[in-house]
Amino acid sequence: AHPLVIEKDLAAANPKEFVAEYKWDGIRVQIVSHSEGCRLYSRTGDEVSKSFPEIIKTIQGNFVLDGELLAGINNDPKTFNDLQQRLNKKAPSEKFIKKNPCFIKVYDVLFFNGDDLRDKTLIERKKVLNSYFSTNRSPMFLSETIEFKDWRFLDKIRDISNKQIHEGVMIKSVSSPYIAGRPRGKWFKWKRNPKNVDAIIMYAQRGHGKRSSFYSDYTFGVFNKEKELVPI
């Protein structure tokens, strides 16, 4: 998805031709399930199944789904920092899993029961997902769409309270097929307005997969009233 250029992209876009979803603050995953079991893959193609055994053992079916892996339980997401605890464990214990549960928000489907749905429109693919999630599929949950009539209303939703665990909204053309990469004009990400804070870098950690050679994950700290440096 391309970052949204408000003056350019919204001016030419009809709200009726798009759907909106929350941009969840987790990691993007593909869920590949078939007769031999289930596997999870990151956006870089790295398999992360062993880090989330409690998820893959409960998923059954014949499909490839696209979604967001989040920390939390019962469809109630926590922060990305909470998820980071799980990402650092390649073989988590049962005790650790219970203390740091995770689930998946699903927002698209590529294959279902042997059918390749990538050339279908987004609306057609959503119908397949709505049917599949008409029954409980925990620890997977359908990522809900946001009802909106105009861009001004969606703008307010996008920048809603910091208590909401999302980075903004995704805007997707209802007629769009599932296309790899970042095709312009079909999917847009509209992030929240940035917030400013004076902080101190406390820790730096290497990323995962292709980002493992870079220090891409940082923990910042601020001073509390007792003048103690605490992580945020």
Language-model-derived ranges and their functions:
Residues 1-232:
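Catalytic cores of nucleic-acid ligases and guanylyltransferases
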